[in-house]
């Protein structure tokens, strides 16, 4: 009996996954040409390059929403093989870390540390160690307790989580994307 139940559960799960995959596949099938994911991705990514920075902390540091946009544009360039776009995104980053260096986020909060996913993605594309070192420094500070740690932050660290853990959905993404990037490099 247990074998039959396990078999039926497996069949149901397989059918459910197959149906979900087919539904997702069909969703993008009939889009107008100008609305394809490739076209929209190219437009959004190229729009980002000349845009002004978004600021966090009264104009001090790059905002995490810009970081997420930048990361998405880099992933788009990598997936589509758009070397020109990747180079433009790299140039924007290089300008930030040289000419606009005062706007590099400090490493004391998840909203700021997520910045590290950009140099880590650039490292994956270019293999330039300067990007790896910068990105890993942002990732590593999520595990190093600061001198002024709060009891709540220490409690997260004592559970084996980053001291920057907060149970906000965007924070869960931001910690995960940075740590996943660090792991993959």
Task: Describe the residue ranges of each PLM region.
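Bacterial Sec-dependent N-terminal signal peptides
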Residues: 1-24
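Mid-chain, structured segments of secreted extracytoplasmic proteins
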Residues: 82-121
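Phosphate/oxyanion-binding loops and surfaces in catalytic or ligand/nucleic-acid-binding neighborhoods
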Residues: 14, 125, 145
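A ubiquitous short alpha-helical element
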Residues: 55-59, 101-105, 163-164
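Well-ordered alpha-helical segments within folded domains of soluble proteins
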Residues: 62-78, 108-124, 167-184
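Glycine-rich flavin
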Residues: 112-123, 129-140, 153-158
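The feature captures the catalytic groove of carbohydrate-active enzymes
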Residues: 141-184
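Low-complexity, Ser/Thr/Pro/Gly-enriched N-terminal "stalk/linker" regions
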Residues: 24-94, 128-137, 141, 145, ...
């Amino acid at each position: 009996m247990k074998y039959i139940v396990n078999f039926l559960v497996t069949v149901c799960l397989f059918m459910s996954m197959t149906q979900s995959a087919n539904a997702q596949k069909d969703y993008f099938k009939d889009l107008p040409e100008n609305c394809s994911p490739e076209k929209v991705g190219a437009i959004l990514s190229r729009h980002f390059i000349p845009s002004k920075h978004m600021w966090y902390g009264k104009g001090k540091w790059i905002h995490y929403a810009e970081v997420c946009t930048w990361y998405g544009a880099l992933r788009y360039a990598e997936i589509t093989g758009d070397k020109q776009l990747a180079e433009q995104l790299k140039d924007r980053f290089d300008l930030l870390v040289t000419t606009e260096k005062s706007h590099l986020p400090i490493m004391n909060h998840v909203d700021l540390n997520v910045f590290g996913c950009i140099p880590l993605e650039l490292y994956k594309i270019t293999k330039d160690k300067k990007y790896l070192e910068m990105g890993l420094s942002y990732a590593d500070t999520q595990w190093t307790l600061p001198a002024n740690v709060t009891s709540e932050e220490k409690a997260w660290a004592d559970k084996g989580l980053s001291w920057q853990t907060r149970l906000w959905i965007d924070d869960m993404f931001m910690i995960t994307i940075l740590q996943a990037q660090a792991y993959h490099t």
